Each structure stands twice: as C-alpha cells, then as structure tokens.
C-alpha cells in the first residue's frame, strides 16, 4: 500500500531539487548546526534515540538539522522507528501503517509489513491502521531529512492519539521488545514533537524550559504533569515520554542540541512555536 505525501508543497518543497536546497539551507542556517555532515559507515551507534520537531521546514528545519547531523554521522540505520502525535484524530489510539511505500519528492521509504506485524505482536497497544496516517504530518516531515542522506530506508511509522504516561509505557516496552528481538540490527528511534504553541517568544521559551528540565531529568511522569499543570502545549508529549522510558532501558542520557522558536527563524516573535533537538547517548 502506497502512502502519498500529504504536506509536500506546504510544510516542505514539492520539487526534489528545491527540497534538497531547503534541507541544505537548514543545515547552514545560523540556528542550524552550521554545515552538512559526512555520512558515517555503519557500525556501533552511540546515539540511538532523538527528539526532532515537525513544523514547516522554514520554521523548524534548522533545529531538526541538529538531530540529523548526529544521526547521519553514524551511518544508515537498518530500521528507523518514528513516533509522532496524531493531530487529525483519525484512526486508533496508537496506529502503525500496514506496510508498503511512503513517498516523498526524494523517493520512497519502505514499511516492511512483516516487521509491522512483529511490532504489533510484542506491543499491547499498537494497531495496524492506515487512517491515522493519511493526512498526518508529524512523521512525513522527517522522511526528506532521512532521504537526503540515505537511500532505501526501512521505517516503522507509529502515531499516538492517546497521550498518557501509561500509553507511553506500553509503546516504549513494545519497542524495547522489538529491539531485543533484532539485536543484530541498527535501529534508531525518532520522537517527533514540537513544544509550546502560539504564545509570545519569551513565554514559550519559559514554558519550554519546564519541559526541557524534565527531559534532562529523564522524568516522563513529571513531564506529563508539567504539560497538564502549566498548559504547555507540546503536541507530541507521548512520543517524548516513550523516548525517555526507552532511553532508560538502554542506559542512555539526553543531550540537548538546540532549543529555539519559530520566531528565531521567521523574525516574528509575537506568536511562536517552540522546537527542540535532542540526542540520547552514553
């Protein structure tokens, strides 16, 4: 089953040459990492988990580039598991694409139906459901960054509608079991999320810092409490919580790579969205 791009031409360029230029712009942007990394050879991976934003590239691309800089340096993963929030409300509580190609202007990424069934079998909450993915952007916008560096990607896209600590625990445990079954594979997990939405820049930076402190403390329940109590409008807090739980199981620590807002890239700081790039390593 083919999944065609839903946000090409809006969140990112729908022309392949222009899209490549946009990605290069993100890496060279003053908010970005400052250059394009050399793709490393496959081998030992010290950064298996990342947090990445998912807005329009002109806004969040330079922040996202920080995570992809480290990912690319360690070579092409065998499998990329991408966790994103469900913005549309379609589909089940936790949904994975059934299998087939995901298309973007830079080519196709493969969703292996057998691996999908295996992840579902070791998880208690993940359902096979294409409806949740048809118009969702949180996973799609990660693919061109990956495809810029790697051909013939194998991905497992999972979107989460029910964003509670309990669901995050189930998702993380299922992924952990899957990783243990495939200990010979190089598997990377991406948690796709933006941070606070539509407050002024200074307010957003303050609210975001509450969340970032909980990420640094590896406190996923505390993160959930902050989001709820302080009205921090993080759209993908379940993917972030799952990444923290999984990182603990893998004995990895968070390293904040970049925190900025859409105001830093657009110049308009009256109403912004916060973005965070984080890697998890030894």
From Swiss-Prot:
InterPro entries xrefs: MEMO1_fam
One Pfam assignment: Memo
TM stretches of this protein: none
Taxonomy, superkingdom: Archaea
Family statement drawn from the similarity comment of this UniProt entry: Belongs to the MEMO1 family.
Protein name listed in UniProt: MEMO1 family protein Msed_2139
